[in-house]
Amino acid sequence: MLRRNILLMSGIAATTSVSTLLAACGGGNNSITNRDIFELVRNDANLSVLGDAIISAGLVQTFQSNTSYTLFAPNNAAFVAVLAELGMTKDELFADKPLLNAVLTYHLLPGKVNFADLLLNTPLKTVQGATLKIDNIAGTLTITDGRARTSRIIQTNLDARNGVVHVVDKVLLPPV
């Protein structure tokens, strides 16, 4: 019995070591590109509020679909800032389904657009219907939203099986 437990524990340790090594090397089952956009967001601690917002808005199927999208994903700090800016709590924002849906779909472009392919100084139509514009300001790519607010793109080309995610430092707001 003791020998069997030792063998079992050795097998678990070996499996864990191989899994850890593959994850550290970026190898294995290419889990990043096998994830859909929603899974990618849900598995990133810095995007947890966005994941909760997607669930609250009832948009999980959109972010899991086979349709390709580009998501400008606001990080958690961006949500904290926009709640203060709007004078709302997270619960109030999440309860306002039309506003939440409009804000989230304003962060989506149809199709997969990698960082290098983003068009500068050109209005880009979002899934929500309004446009946003990407500019290069002093060497930093920024997005100007429908209320003339700017957001920096701080992380790029997080690949998902149904598109790509670029992390931004502000929640983008559509025009009023």
Map each language-model feature to its residues.
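Mature, structured domains of secreted/extracytosolic soluble proteins
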Residues: 2-13, 18-176
